[in-house]
Amino acid sequence: KTTVREMEVLGIEPDTHMLEIARLLHQGAKALQTGFARLKANPLAAERDAAAVRKTERQTEKVYRKAIAELFDPEHYAQALAERRREPGDDLELLLEPMDQAGCSSVAKGLSFVMEALKRREIYRHLSNAADHLAHAGDILHDIVVKTA
């Protein structure tokens, strides 16, 4: 919920990496819920669910690392801008008004790249942290299975 609110405040639309991480988090949460539901009746199945939860965390971290690598790649940023048909600095016009017109374009492009990267990194960190918490819950499920088996 707070991640969605931050995306709204920062004006960030979800990208393919965010959507993939969200899908993995949903998959892990479902496995965790199923594992706790099966804990008493079928501990071996609950252990498989705990392993599935931990696997989704590892998969999420792979997507996160790929997203961060692309995020700080200027060529990837330029391609993404072209796909969205936006000019770097479109959202920074008011900030750059007092600057000399000759220098605005390159400053706007650089500043826009940095601002976009920082905003997206913040969202990626939120999602990665959620995966870490999910994995911790999966570890707890595993510990319960070990102690009760």
Task: Please annotate each region the language model reported.
Residues 1-149:
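Cytosolic, long alpha-helical scaffolding segments
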